[in-house]
Amino acid sequence: TDAXNPPEGPQDRGSQQKGRLSLQNTAEIQHCLVNAGDVGCGVFECFENNXCXIXXLHXISFIKAHALRFGCISREMVFQLQRECYLKHDLCMINFRDLLLHEPYVDLVNLLLTCGEDVKEAVTRSIQAQCEQNWGGLCSILSFCTSNVQRPXAXQPXADRAQVSRPHHHDTGHHLLEAIXGAKGERGSKSHPSVRA
């Protein structure tokens, strides 16, 4: 193969890697991560997300859902670069409809809640705004529907609660409601969090 030949540029690298990268081949994943030019969003060209567009995040979260196939070093690199990518793009827009359709996407959003307060607040604002825009008053009912679920988990730190909620097909909706309701509760308790420029 031509895997040993260095590509001419980032776009060429993205198109070449996209066709031959296998999630099951740790060596290819490590090669992709090590040889990606810029540290940041460009790395995800390797993972069929060459624009770092938010609509393709479920493809990245699919990789995270199979992270046990990675070595520890590769997994940590993916986490670090993914976080840097989201911070660079200010999480642009989380696609609310993808939360309803893609289980790995929901898993990813739950994991994002563990990435520090800045990221958590950005995710919360984005989900809350779209929830209200799409569902209106129904969005406020979600906190009522999940209040019994949240009480036992309230003793856990928010990061632990989000980390535990890796959804399966039958409870994806449950964890999504928990994430949205938790976002509403936190937003209500803080009233107006400090705005960071």
UniProtKB/Swiss-Prot annotation:
User: Keyword Disulfide bond on this protein?
Assistant: yes
Region (Disordered), start-end ranges: 1-20
Q: Where in the cell is it found?
A: Secreted
Determine if Disulfide bond is one of this entry's keywords.
Answer: yes
What is a biological process (GO) this protein takes part in? intracellular calcium ion homeostasis
Chief subcellular location? secreted
Q: GO: which molecular function terms? A: hormone activity
Q: Which PANTHER family is this protein grouped with? A: STANNIOCALCIN, STANNIOCALCIN-2
Q: Which UniProt keywords apply?
A: Disulfide bond, Hormone, Secreted
Report the protein name in the record.
Stanniocalcin-2
A GO cellular component term found in this entry reads: extracellular space
- What organism does this protein naturally occur in? Cavia porcellus (Guinea pig)
Family to which this protein belongs: Belongs to the stanniocalcin family.
**InterPro entries xref list:** Stanniocalcin
Task of the protein? Has an anti-hypocalcemic action on calcium and phosphate homeostasis.
Q: How does it assemble?
A: Homodimer; disulfide-linked.
